[in-house]
Amino acid sequence: MARNGEGSVRPQARLLVAKGSFSVMGGGERDIIRNLPALSKKFKVTVATLDSSNELDSLCEEYGLDLMKPDVRWTPPKGPISRILDRGFSSSLESWKSIEGLVEILGDLDYLHLTSGDGSLSILEIIPARISVHLHLLEPHRGLHEDVLHRMVDGSPRRNLSLTRAALSMARRKDLSKMRRVSSRDRTAISGNSEFTSSRIEDVYGISSGVLPPSLDPEEFPSSRLEDESSSLFEIDSPYVVTIGRASWAKGTWEAISMLRGTGFSLALVGGGEDESIDSLIEHAKSCQVGLWVAPRLDSSDLCSLVKGAVAVISMAHSEPFGLTPIEAQSLGTPALFVDEGGFRETISDGVSGRLLPRDDYSAWHEALAEAGEADNRSSWSKNGRANIANMGLNPEVFSKRLEEIFLSLE
């Protein structure tokens, strides 16, 4: 297993940037799109995906990057039988093979930067052995190795968890086998997106990995951005806090509403969710007398306006791989109040650049909300957070340099 190296990649080495799906446009997808312009300065970049997004289409057109995708958009097979039999791997492989010209360009390729997710790993079946591969493993397969994704938005099991785990045993064994096969491939490096993720990769798969953190574009989240009348613009009852991520138990959405009971704060949820989950959250918010506003997705400009107008950005997510949302909040000058778990510990210093709080101590959260409203705290936490972002090198240029060094270490 190779780790970061030293040196300089030869001019315009040919890099394929690939991910199975971009349609969700979560943190992982935003990070890739954010890094593509910087990567295109170091490499001759081609992008490939089975399920593109408008944001990816627009950026590739703007920067003149070749974007390769199938004529028919791929989506993961639905249903328990498909998950048990791992049909997504075979169907995604066929979709990769169907992309016009993809197999042909592999002969001229130098490097593959592959980001994990639905449909991603199967592309390795058609990658020649001579090509250096970097797998950015954002998290082990949570649906196979944890139970948080098998719970309803309120935390209740979708079905018996023991039976679910037993039913997924074949898919789990296949996942372990695939990851160990990737780790033993020559000219291959695996990186988590945080020290926490790297430790989880070791725990779940028994393989070592490096760390390649995501990045933040200062122009996308500028500290000097003017505040808009966000509550009026988005019709949210003020004061409000923001939580980002598709509504689920894993993202802690239900718990965030429970915590806000009695505070007078509304919750703006960015990320949407299944209709059943949103309906349940609406009823839960009513019972807690918490205002709830939901947006499936916002562009960067609207998201910045929403966050700037908030008292705080909060999250009670379970074992989040990397704390990207906190640094976005810090960049915009909005306090970050997050559960003291997972990757959040790597981007928030408690009481210095935000707050890390015990999940079940709601009184501590309420005190933190009061602290977040104080001008001195908002100023100092944001200043310290931005300094930490700079110290960690969380920007597209440093990301590109780190990826370059990883590939050089494989030669």
Question: What is each residue range found by the language model?
Answer:
Residues R30-R34, P239, R246-G262, E276:
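A conserved mid-protein helix/loop that constitutes part of the nucleotide-sugar donor-binding site
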Residues T49-N54, I244, S266-L281, P296:
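Glycosyltransferase donor-sugar binding loop
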Residues L93, D360, D376-L408:
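A charged, aromatic-enriched C-terminal amphipathic alpha-helix characteristic of glycosyltransferases
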Residues H141, M152-I190, S198:
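Membrane-proximal helix-turn-helix segments that form the acceptor-binding/catalytic region
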Residues D279-S301:
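Nucleotide-activated donor-binding/catalytic signature segment of Leloir-type glycosyltransferases, i.e.
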Residues H318:
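Aromatic "clamp/platform" in nucleotide-sugar-dependent glycosyltransferases that forms part
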Residues P335-V339:
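Short hydrophobic beta-strand element within catalytic cores of glycosyltransferases
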Residues D350-G351, R355-S363, A370-D376:
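Conserved acidic donor-binding segment of nucleotide-sugar-dependent glycosyltransferases
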